[in-house]
Amino acid sequence: MSLEPQAAYEAVVSEMIATSPTASGKMFGMPCLKNSNGKAFAGYTESAMVFKLGGPSHAEALALPGSNLFDPSERGRPMKEWVVVPFEHSSRWLEFARDAFDYVANKK
């Protein structure tokens, strides 16, 4: 049984809240996940998830077909650490959410 985009996002939210100090919130008007310090590390927009990633995880996510850097202003100024991963790769969303959580937690 395949999930719809919103349901797939909600499954990631439920799992992250159950397994890490995570809360749901808003960022740029979109639903997002934040760590216990209130730092956003993932979000949901237009049937895709966005993740704040670094290193190999960033490169891996960006290399997926249809993925791109997140540009919330839509003015050609993408946020270099944030990658949009479309629904077609939703089977990887939880993996990237965990990587993003760790990346934000360990960022100096």
What annotation goes with each model-predicted range?
Residues M1-K108:
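Charge-dense, helix-prone N-terminal extensions
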